[in-house]
């Protein structure tokens, strides 16, 4: 096992409101779920997620909070030495998007210039409340954004690929094979996916609103 261990490893912190699907998302990667370790002192699970790229294997040690965010903020020990992050919200819950700036503020207070991906989860659910046109925080803060659906595996690899390109410094980096993922629990409607991709493209070409607040 040891000789196959990827040389390139990154600490990735997964943050966002409770119930947005962070644990569901990280558990999709089967070997990471099988090999996860619980860090009792911080109350976190660390999932080792390996991806095979055209530049060799890389491993994200993904820190998942095990639900403590429901009791307020996370301790600095969770963020310290993080090299990248995913902030997650639930597109069916406006309040989880409204809280994104708080998560971002806590993160950058401890980790100044790390690459961050914002993910809107549960896009498989028809009753979407947070539409593409209202998702602007990432544009103001220079983050990447993806719609995802953890339960259907839709766009699962996208945040990891974007982060890998930033961390390795190679915009042409590609995944040469996909990790084994848990079978989809639901199917993402391809028509809906195409519509959302179109909506995001249109939104990205629209001027940002003028107001100065965080949303």
From Swiss-Prot:
EC class name? hydrolase
- Reaction catalysed by this enzyme: GTP + H2O = GDP + phosphate + H(+)
SMART domains for the chain: RAB (SM00175), RAN (SM00176), RAS (SM00173), RHO (SM00174)
Family matches, as CDD domains:
Ran
Q: List the molecular function annotations (GO) for this entry.
A: GTP binding; GTPase activity; magnesium ion binding
According to the record, cofactor stoichiometry and binding are noted as: Mg(2+) interacts primarily with the phosphate groups of the bound guanine nucleotide.
Cite the binding residues for GTP.
17-24, 35-41, 67, 121-124, 149-151
Q: Where is this region: Switch-I?
A: 36-44
Tissue expression, as annotated, is:
Ubiquitous, with the highest expression in ovary, muscle, eye and brain.
Q: Which Pfam families match?
A: Ras
GO biological process, any? protein import into nucleus
Its primary localisation, in coarse terms, equals nucleus
| PROSITE patterns from the UniProt entry | RAN
Cellular component GO terms held in the UniProt record: cytoplasm; cytosol; nuclear envelope; nucleus
Site entry (Essential for GTP hydrolysis), positions = 68
User: Would the keyword Nucleus be found if you checked this record's keyword annotation?
Assistant: yes
Q: Which cofactors are required for activity?
A: Mg(2+)
E.C. no: 3.6.5.-
Assigned protein family: Belongs to the small GTPase superfamily. Ran family.
Summarize the subunit comment: Monomer. Interacts with rangap1, which promotes ran-mediated GTP hydrolysis. Interacts with kpnb1. Interaction with kpnb1 inhibits rangap1-mediated stimulation of GTPase activity. Interacts with rcc1 which promotes the exchange of ran-bound GDP by GTP. Interaction with kpnb1 inhibits rcc1-mediated exchange of ran-bound GDP by GTP. Interacts (GTP-bound form) with tnpo1; the interaction is direct. Interacts (GTP-bound form) with tnpo3; the interaction is direct. Interacts with kpnb1 and with tnpo1; both inhibit ran GTPase activity.
The entry's protein name is: GTP-binding nuclear protein Ran
Question: Which species expresses this protein natively?
Answer: Danio rerio
Q: Could you tell me the gene encoding this protein? A: ran
